[in-house]
Amino acid sequence: MFFRIASIITPVVLIIFAGWVYGRRAHPDMSGINKATLDVIAPMLVVSAFVSKDFELLEQWNLLLCGVAIVLGSGILAWPIARLSGMDPKTFVPPMMFNNCGNMGLPLAVFAFGTVGLAPAVALFAVSNLMHFTLGVKLVNPKASVKGVFANPMVIATILGVFLSTTKHLYTLPEPLYQSIKLLGDATVPLMLFSLGVRMKDANLKHWREGFLGAAICPIAGLVVALLISPFIPMTDLQRGLLFVFASLPPAVLNFLVADRNKQDPELVASIVLLGNLSAMIFVPIGLYLGLK
């Protein structure tokens, strides 16, 4: 089991490390690539996953509902911890709820379960993103407007993907169009990992105490919720494995972008995100062990 987990984690770590080394040496401006990834490439991955022949949306509802429960349950568990530690819940709670199911979760799903694990992992990623751009933004800034959420490419891709998936028996995309979408979307996984490595070279450890607390609470809360609900929800072995990987993931980089946009202590959130992603070396193997056993 140890060698299997190591073989899953190693490619993820090496690609992130390659991004970090390149970032330290070349100091690239990744803003254009990151924007293209979020606006075009990742949405194509969502659409291609939902319409793939091996993916049936109705068969994934239990997994997706469990994913929603982990997001909400982690927030409920994190709220009193934020109060007790003297942190503003608007700063601390969202990073505990919304994890790195894109940059790290998608590659782990592929390396752990093969290509058959990608489509349901993308569905989890899409649902988590939809919650982040609505509930997550409101938690950080209760006055924020979410009217523009339906103009977000990821949200549009999710809605389109759900529609195409549920109408697959009536209409399918022409094969050349599907292959074009899939080819572009397949670039998401390595780009996200490499970009995460580049971003980590600029990390701020000013709030390292809060960062270590968040690094532990995010995966622990997720795994606790997963352990509580998994015995009562019927799932396949693949779905159970994906659920525990999802539960063990660190805070998403997107939390920093949302905090920065809303001026909600972005430096503290940056520390939580950085140390959380470093701590993935500890908690993701635990999630893999629970999901693979």
Locations of regions flagged by a protein language model:
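Alpha-helical transmembrane segments of multi-pass small-molecule/ion transporters
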Residues: 1-293
